[in-house]
């Protein structure tokens, strides 16, 4: 059973990578901030970050990468539907102000984030989750047939590994 799970996981990863190669224009892979900072970005004029939990400091450990700190000064820095995923605490406000004042355009997903950023003098707008940018026909063009499961299952989506949550999900599935 363990081998079957490994094979299924490899198959899913291959399909995901094929999707990225077919539909997303990717740069080479970077593994740390210094690699990004030392790159020559001569042909790039806009840097964009955003979406799911990208500015949740608890998940990203306040990593500079998510605030585009590596981008050259003469480029445009922007976010699209950047998500904090939680309420912005008073202690986090100075950090966000220092990082986001460098951005040219900011959009966030949560209304609460928009309001908190306005309170600290950061202009931004609220945008929808990017998953809603495509219509049904566009999504169907990219979809594949998935065989129907032979038995009921529970789908678990975790932002970070959690043995406690996995135990709850396994208990629920019984």
Where are these regions (language model features)?
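Short intrinsically disordered, low-complexity coil segments enriched in acidic
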Residues: 1-5, 134, 174
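Aromatic- and Gly/Pro-rich donor/ligand-binding loops
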Residues: 1-98
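A nucleotide-sugar donor-handling region in carbohydrate enzymes
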Residues: 32-41, 55, 81-159, 163
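Active-site regions of enzymes building and remodeling cell-envelope glycoconjugates
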Residues: 66, 75-77, 121-126, 174
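Hydrophobic/aromatic ligand-binding patch that stacks against planar heteroaromatic rings
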Residues: 69, 116, 172
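Short hydrophobic signal-anchor/transmembrane segments that target glycosyltransferases
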Residues: 164-173
